[in-house]
């Protein structure tokens, strides 16, 4: 499962009730840590344990890496911003969002300047679920605007505060450049 999910959390949230439950895969990693580490070393991977976040994750040359599309990256940035704001404002019990709130953050920050397709939302939600950033109470295809989406702290591992601010600025500059291009008259180049 570590190869399919990229990390294993100590607590997983029940997709229906969104209540925390112990993850048996985490306990297996704790019990057999040295064997798993030796096995993964042969494959060119390293299993890293983060005791503060209570996760095991793969890293190294043998670990699968995935390039996210720009749209997925922007959605991850928005979810990271929501997570930060909820933790700072309401504490750990408030780490639930929904598509409506993500869209609102996107409009307010200028990161989502167009309506995203259902396929773009599905891709982003699927990848965030695969990488243990979120938990959905239903299949990705069944998620509606008000469906609760539980946010895991692992989103902090994928997007640091510095990375988040840098990417937001970069995407805003790109959006501004595109807006200027659209407003230029057709004969401006002549």
Regions found by a protein language model. Name each.
Residues 87-94, 112-119, 137:
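Short acidic, glycine/proline-enriched loop segments that cap or flank alpha-helices
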Residues 60-95:
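Short alpha-helical segments that sit at the start of domains
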Residues 41-49, 125, 129-141:
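A short, conserved structural fragment
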Residues 148-190:
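Short, amphipathic alpha-helical interaction segments positioned at domain boundaries
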Residues 28-36, 113-130:
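Short amphipathic alpha-helical interaction segments
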Residues 55-60, 135-162:
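Accessory beta->alpha helical hairpin/"wing" motif in late/C-terminal subdomains of nucleic-acid enzymes
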Residues 14-23, 89-108:
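Short acidic, hydrophobic short linear motifs in intrinsically disordered regions
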Residues 1-59:
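Eukaryotic partner-binding/assembly regions in large regulatory complexes
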């Amino acid at each position: 499962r570590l190869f399919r999910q990229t990390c294993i959390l100590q607590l997983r949230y029940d997709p229906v009730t969104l209540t925390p439950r112990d993850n048996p895969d985490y306990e297996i990693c704790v019990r057999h840590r040295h064997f798993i580490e030796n096995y993964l070393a042969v494959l060119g991977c390293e299993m890293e344990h983060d005791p503060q976040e209570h996760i095991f994750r793969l890293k190294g040359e043998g670990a699968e890496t995935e390039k996210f599309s720009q749209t997925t990256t922007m959605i991850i940035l928005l979810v990271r911003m929501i997570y930060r704001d909820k933790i700072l404002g309401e504490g750990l019990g408030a780490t639930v969002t929904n598509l409506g709130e993500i869209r609102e953050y996107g409009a307010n920050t200028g990161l989502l300047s167009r309506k995203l397709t259902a396929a773009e939302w599905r891709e982003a939600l699927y990848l965030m679920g695969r990488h243990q950033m979120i938990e959905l109470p239903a299949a990705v295809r069944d998620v509606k605007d008000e469906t609760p989406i539980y946010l895991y702290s692992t989103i902090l591992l994928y997007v640091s505060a510095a990375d988040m601010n840098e990417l937001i600025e970069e995407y805003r500059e790109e959006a501004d450049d595109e807006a200027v291009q659209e407003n230029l008259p057709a004969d401006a180049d002549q």
